[in-house]
Amino acid sequence: MDKLFNFDLSNRSQLSQELLNLGISNFNDALIYIQNLPYGRNSNRSDYSLILKEQKGTCSTKHAFLAALAKQEGKSEIKLYVGIYKMYEKNTPGVSGVLEKWQLPYVPEAHCYLKINDTIVDVTRNNNSNISFKSSLLFEEEILSHQIGDYKVMLHQTFLKSWLTSDAILYDFKTLWQIREACIRSLSK
């Protein structure tokens, strides 16, 4: 992880205290620690604090945790974003089998990431696929950490419904959502 932006963790916030108890004393070390947690859905998709307890996380919970940590530490340079991007094998290895089965070149997927001083930081991807992700963005919006649950899903579903009609996709929304879920499951294998 590039040392794009760093600060020492204080003992004044709950998230900082949890990290300090793990021996993590600054933001860059927190980024690396969270990046190394395995990908996996948490028991509550809206509760980003579960990543430490469950030792796994998604793009939403990992980045929401880091954004909340930065906010609790008074660091406004770190912002949480949700983007909708074209998910295909090149930028999301592991989804080609599902996309080929349904004869789709890509599926619009919602993805959370950070922007630190307007530079994208994504702890769920390696640097090579990060380049493809940026070039595949269709839409992005700054959100707050508590918006990773229902709001993110609503935003994603609204985008997909619009995409279905504008790109003349042959599937209905329910089928498309199932295809998307199959792609996500393929990432956990």
Regions found by a protein language model. Name each.
Residues 55-82, 114:
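Cysteine-centered nucleophilic/redox motifs
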Residues 47, 83-84:
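Residue-level "edge-of-site" marker
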Residues 29, 65-68, 109:
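Short Gly/charged-rich anion-binding patches and loops
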Residues 2-10, 14-22, 39, 84-189:
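His-Asp-centered catalytic microenvironments across diverse enzyme cores
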